[in-house]
Amino acid sequence: MQRLCAYVLIHVLALAACSEASWKPGFQLQDASSGPGANRGKEPHELDRLGPASHHRRQLGLQGPPHLVADLAKKQGPWMEEEEEAYGWMDFGRRSAEEGDQRP
């Protein structure tokens, strides 16, 4: 009996996870047809009427892709430092040119 309950529970959870995207089809279609910049200039209460979007998705819709790309371009992560350390030894051509410029 416990095994049957476990199977039913797993099946219900899997079904709920697979059908999560299909329980809001109206908002998905409206969002796709409106385009990325269509929510620009709308009031927050108007955005609430459009559908149950997440806070993050609303921010992306209001901000627009060009701003998002610019913000991501400004950020530098720790991987930049790792690349400098890993490939710094291969940068001998630039370093020797800089050393040549410093000598009188």
Swiss-Prot record:
It comes from Sus scrofa (Pig). GO terms for biological process: G protein-coupled receptor signaling pathway; response to food. Gastrin stimulates the stomach mucosa to produce and secrete hydrochloric acid and the pancreas to secrete its digestive enzymes. It also stimulates smooth muscle contraction and increases blood circulation and water secretion in the stomach and intestine. This is Gastrin. Belongs to the gastrin/cholecystokinin family. The modification Sulfotyrosine is found at residue 87. It comes from the Eukaryota. One of its GO terms (cellular component) is extracellular space. Residues 40-49 have a biased composition (Basic and acidic residues). Residues 22-58, 96-104 form a propeptide. The modification Phosphoserine is found at residue 96. Residues 1-21 form the signal peptide. The keyword Hydrolase does not apply. Sulfation enhances proteolytic processing, and blocks peptide degradation. Levels of sulfation differ between proteolytically-cleaved gastrins. Thus, gastrin-6 is almost 73% sulfated, whereas the larger gastrins are less than 50% sulfated. Sulfation levels are also tissue-specific. Keywords: Amidation, Cleavage on pair of basic residues, Hormone, Phosphoprotein, Pyrrolidone carboxylic acid, Secreted, Signal, Sulfation. It is found in: Secreted. The keyword Transmembrane helix does not apply. Residues 27-67 are annotated as: Disordered. The modification Pyrrolidone carboxylic acid is found at residues 59, 76.
